[in-house]
């Protein structure tokens, strides 16, 4: 009995220690300053030579903080609100980073809001359709942010992804009402459920617009659950024509593995395959797993597991391990931000992205490789092929 009790105590102690370090990081992160709404107020400054100006369109279920404001808070709105922002990215910008202003925004070194305006639905659609960059149709890229994110953080992250990708697609942020608090995990779960129908509305709007070309929708963290649920709902309501036009990417999905399996069973195979970006050392997802009763999260699965490999092929999903990419955040949860600049933009280079199965993102040449190919390089001391 004593040995059994001692073993149980040791197990609890180990579990506590495994959680303690991430928990301390979370506490420290909570003490850090967060960007406020003042960053969204266009100042007297203009963009400078060498800066890049990007346009971000917004569809949101967040409340407006004032009747005449283009700033959004954490409360929920049943109706979509639309807006447009122009953001200047400094000439000194480093890939995947957001250069937050320290004091008065300076376009020489900071991200700066140049303009903002509210739109109605007709203006929103027309403005996006006009982002065709000389092509017959306008491509669209939709970003769905994750847990513990305020509006300005989501907006500037979308601007960073847009600028680093050098894509000419119209960039759209779907902003759901996150509490922007580390204690708001359950509230955020409710908020993504609250927003599901409105994301379906946005995707349907684009998917049935003949003046829209390709549609890429990328979810991050808890935003992946919202994205997957929206696609599932499109399937359940017979909107297969909309689904056929979507390219779905889930980055570090904070989704229970069993829940994801059920979602995928309804969604079915996509063409191109749904892409899932994972990293087994994601600290944020390890905390999520712990507080969810040790239920494994999709974004932290181990691609060397034969069961994972078989499941990916069977479900026609591309699982991409991005653990080789540098992590800019303490929680190793935002690696996907590096992908914007590294993903091939030439269609001829994107052939691997249409294959189902498990792959590792090889930073040498920005290509995909099987985990076994990379392992053989390590054992053999080889370089790039």
Can you name each region flagged by the protein language model?
Residues 3-20:
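Bacterial N-terminal signal peptides that target proteins for export
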Residues 142-146:
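The conserved beta1-alpha1 loop
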Residues 139:
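Alpha/beta-hydrolase fold active-site loops
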Residues 32, 36-115, 128-130, 134-135, ...:
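Lipolytic serine-hydrolase domain surface
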Residues 219, 223, 227:
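Gly/Ala-rich beta-loop-alpha elbow adjacent to hydrolase catalytic centers
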Residues 27-30:
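C-terminal motif of bacterial Sec signal peptides marking the signal peptidase cleavage site
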Residues 150-153:
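Short substrate-entry loop that stabilizes the transition state in hydrolases
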